[in-house]
Amino acid sequence: MEEALFDVPLYRQFAGLGGMNRLPDRVSILRFRHLLEQHDLAPKMLEAVNATLAAKGLMLKEGTAVDASLIAAPSSTKNNTGTRDPEMHQTKKGNQWYFGMKCHIGVDADSGLVHTVVGTSANVNDVTQAHALVHGEEADVFADAG
């Protein structure tokens, strides 16, 4: 995320960070993520953004594309108690092994705007989360063979 904020001006603008000298470091981003998780705010934030987009006619709801992205972490990643985080697991993608989590995403097929996000361990099969990524109003759902 730190690199994305550095590389993509639109991300900085969306986050209200302004210039390059106000960018948070990895530790600040991680603390913020933990606060979002602790107070269950991420789903509420996504819901508020999506409501704004729908009100402006940008979220069409006629089709959904679903996919997952691997979020790799160092295998030594530990939680607050000093033990390995039980939510992170190992998985194989192609011929390469990874340790971490997966982000399963549902996007509006026409606009490409994200409407649903589900986080799981990296070893969870993409197909098992497909039902959670659709909103039920679609005429079409698109997915890869994953």
Predicted regions mapped to residue ranges:
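Polybasic low-complexity intrinsically disordered regions
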Residues: 3-6, 15-17, 21-146
